[in-house]
Amino acid sequence: MREILHIQGGQCGNQIGAKFWEVICDEHGIDQTGKYAGDSDLQLERINVYYNEASGGRFVPRAVLMDLEPGTMDSLRSGPYGQIFRPDNFVFGQSGAGNNWAKGHYTEGAELIDSVLDVVRKEAENCDCLQGFQVCHSLGGGTGSGMGTLLISKIREEYPDRMMLTFSVFPSPKVSDTVVEPYNATLSVHQLVENADECMVLDNEALYDICFRTLKLATPTFGDLNHLISATMSGVTCCLRFPGQLNSDLRKLAVNLIPFPRLHFFMVGFAPLTSRGSQQYRALTVPELTQQMWDSKNMMCAADPRHGRYLTASAMFRGKMSTKEVDEQMLNVQNKNSSYFVEWIPNNVKSSVCDIPPTGLSMSSTFVGNSTSIQEMFRRVSEQFTAMFRRKAFLHWYTGEGMDEMEFTEAESNMNDLVAEYQQYQDATADEEEEYDEEEEEEAA
């Protein structure tokens, strides 16, 4: 079976992860003690993608939970599903990273990383055919960003041929939690560009907007935001866990979405998003789902796809529907909005259909798009980074942990290169291709 090993780090990662396991347990009919209480064999057929079966018929998540302070883990453990995790898989320090990337990556995190890797190895050895890792973390803090990227690079060394998928929460433009977010995020992106295979980019502000505008919540909590994220996470892997007419897995997703290795930062969306009270009044159709999932208001990161072009995209539908209708709708989207797709990748939308819808819905769809407009996010972080770095503000917190200013400069230029690459492919047309080859040859020469 194609197992996925789930890793969550830092406060944000652990809170998203906790919500994710609630959703997955719900879909597979696992109760809060880890016992199966479902009603369909399909729930059990491929349950070992995310669960180990332990003695006494208990199902234990393949999850590794790490943090540099015990607080979030304690509340997770006392939460509704706290008892289903394997106790040994909680790895935490006492010191905290204090929103400092250097602490997470070089000092505190480096002390804890070996015990995390031991747990990861143990879990990986339990797998029959490990497909890859999914990591939940934020890029604005210290642990999720610093220690998260450290773990990703270590796993990369040890399991070079396995997929590495991250769900990364970027700092938002308007909602800022800490002053040094731009530093932490830039240093993390520097790592993610090199070591991750696929990054799903999330951002609190866009999630808040969805909660206000679409879900009509007056006071959205982090719980509501994390619920949105976990719906998407579940959608990305539903094809691995339930039978479907058109399957997709992490590797197929990567092959279809990544035209150039560095450009692996995706926007994600989910449909249907309806406010909590009004779900029962909606009859869903494939055209409605399609329209909603391509809507820029549905994107879970603060970049507007109308400001760029899609290099590639993938749509994962769930529920009983005809594949013919799905294909027609996807073609329809591409034909009507052809200016928003690059013309030098002809059929650039992949679709997959899984027969089992999520709990409480008759059908749903998950959208993953590789759009050049994601550069807006990097650009925004980069501007904030430069503003502070020019004055060397807050740098002593990082150099004090043994970092060098050079690292900051490298991370900054790597991020700017990334933005430039996105821009280059946004402007490229099908008939210009030869020019680029010549330019590259000149550069090489």
Swiss-Prot record:
Question: Can you quote a single GO CC term?
Answer: cytoplasm
The residues the record assigns to binding Mg(2+) are 69
Q: Does the keyword Hydrolase apply?
A: no
Q: Where is the composition biased (Acidic residues)?
A: 429-445
Cite the InterPro entries for this sequence: Beta-tubulin_BS, Beta_tubulin, Tub_FtsZ_C, Tubulin, Tubulin/FtsZ-like_C, Tubulin/FtsZ_2-layer-sand-dom, Tubulin/FtsZ_GTPase_sf, Tubulin_C
Needed cofactors, names only, are: Mg(2+)
Q: Where in the cell is it found?
A: Cytoplasm, Cytoskeleton
Q: Which residues bind GTP?
A: 11, 69, 138, 142-144, 204, 226
The source's superkingdom equals Eukaryota
Function of this protein?
Tubulin is the major constituent of microtubules, a cylinder consisting of laterally associated linear protofilaments composed of alpha- and beta-tubulin heterodimers. Microtubules grow by the addition of GTP-tubulin dimers to the microtubule end, where a stabilizing cap forms. Below the cap, tubulin dimers are in GDP-bound state, owing to GTPase activity of alpha-tubulin.
Descriptive protein name: Tubulin beta-3 chain
Species of origin: Triticum aestivum
Organism lineage reads as: Eukaryota, Viridiplantae, Streptophyta, Embryophyta, Tracheophyta
